[in-house]
Every structure is written in structure tokens, then in C-alpha cells.
């Protein structure tokens, strides 16, 4: 997994300092990973902002409650199987993603069957990206 081939596109700003601290901790451990914050608005405007931000060479990975749930090991294997494909992990705002955006997904992913605030989902995702890299590199970080 190459962090420079991944972007996180998220609606809204992280307002809680402890969440931001966690995100920054993992961002430093994943050099090259980009996080794009888009302004929160109504779902249609958010969808338009996301569509405009997605690059043609990226596969959108939409994070949603109804997406595929994977173990950390399965997640790392999936990332490895995608090789050099550029990925854009998309986290919607408080109202989630529109049906139109969900239809653009190359992969629909759920971090859990539970619902989390979108800023916490960002922290969980970036930690799982770091964990996936650690698993693929044989690092002792993942000890399941």
C-alpha cells in the first residue's frame, strides 16, 4: 500500500482537538497521504463538491454504514490487491452520501455496522490505513 496513492476526501472540519491530534499522529506515519476537507452544506452541494474533487484516475471508495465490512487483515489484503490504483476514500457529512455519489463507488466500505460522527470516522479510517501498511510490512504494530 502506497499512502501517496490514497486521498481522504471528507465533508466538514475536525472540531475536536483530540480527534485532530490522532489524525495528525497517523498522517505523520503515512507520508504522502492527503486529506481534503470540503465545506459542509446540504447533501446536494456536498455531493457536487465531492464530484469536482474526485480525479479521473481515482477509484472512489465510499464509506457508508451499508458498505462491506472487513477485518483489518482483509482490508490490508484488499489494498494490496489493488496495487498501484489511486484511491479516494470519501466520508460524507452528517446526512451521509447521496444515492448519486454511492452509485459512483468502485468500492463501498463500512468501518463498522455502528454509526460514528464523520470526524471520528476520519480518525478510524486513517488508523486502519496505517494498520494495513503495518500488516503488509510485517510490522509488530498489528498484534491480533
From Swiss-Prot:
Q: Which CDD domains match?
A: RlmH-like
Q: Name one GO molecular function term.
A: rRNA (pseudouridine-N3-)-methyltransferase activity
Q: Does the keyword Cytoplasm apply?
A: yes
- Write out the annotated subcellular location: Cytoplasm
One cellular-component annotation, GO: cytoplasm
Q: Which InterPro entries match?
A: Alpha/beta_knot_MTases, RlmH-like, tRNA_m1G_MTases_N
The chemistry this enzyme catalyses reads: pseudouridine(1915) in 23S rRNA + S-adenosyl-L-methionine = N(3)-methylpseudouridine(1915) in 23S rRNA + S-adenosyl-L-homocysteine + H(+)
Name the keywords, alphabetized. Answer: Cytoplasm, Methyltransferase, rRNA processing, S-adenosyl-L-methionine, Transferase
Which residues hold S-adenosyl-L-methionine?
92, 111-116
Q: Say where the protein is mainly found.
A: cytoplasm
**One Pfam family of this chain:** SPOUT_MTase
Q: List the EC numbers from the record.
A: 2.1.1.177
Domain of life assignment: Bacteria
Does this entry carry the keyword Iron-sulfur? no
Q: Which SUPFAM superfamilies match?
A: alpha/beta knot
Q: Which family does it belong to?
A: Belongs to the RNA methyltransferase RlmH family.
Q: What does this protein do?
A: Specifically methylates the pseudouridine at position 1915 (m3Psi1915) in 23S rRNA.
Q: How does it assemble?
A: Homodimer.
**What's this protein's name?**
Ribosomal RNA large subunit methyltransferase H
Which organism is this entry from?
Synechococcus sp. (strain CC9311)
Gene that produces this protein? rlmH
Amino acid at each position: 500500500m502506497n499512502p501517496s496513492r490514497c486521498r481522504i476526501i471528507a465533508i466538514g472540519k475536525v472540531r475536536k482537538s483530540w480527534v485532530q491530534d490522532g489524525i495528525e499522529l497517523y498522517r505523520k506515519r503515512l507520508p504522502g497521504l492527503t486529506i481534503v476537507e470540503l465545506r459542509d452544506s446540504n447533501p446536494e452541494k456536498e455531493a457536487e463538491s465531492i464530484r469536482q474533487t474526485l480525479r479521473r484516475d481515482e477509484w472512489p471508495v465510499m464509506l457508508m454504514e451499508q458498505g462491506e465490512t472487513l477485518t483489518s487483515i482483509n482490508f490490508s489484503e484488499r489494498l494490496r490487491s489493488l496495487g498501484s490504483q489511486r484511491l479516494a476514500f470519501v466520508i460524507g457529512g452528517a446526512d451521509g452520501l447521496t444515492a448519486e455519489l454511492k452509485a459512483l463507488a468502485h468500492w463501498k466500505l463500512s468501518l463498522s455496522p455502528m454509526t460514528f460522527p464523520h470526524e471520528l470516522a476520519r480518525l478510524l479510517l486513517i488508523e486502519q490505513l496505517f494498520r494495513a501498511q503495518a500488516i503488509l510490512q510485517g510490522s509488530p504494530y498489528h498484534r491480533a
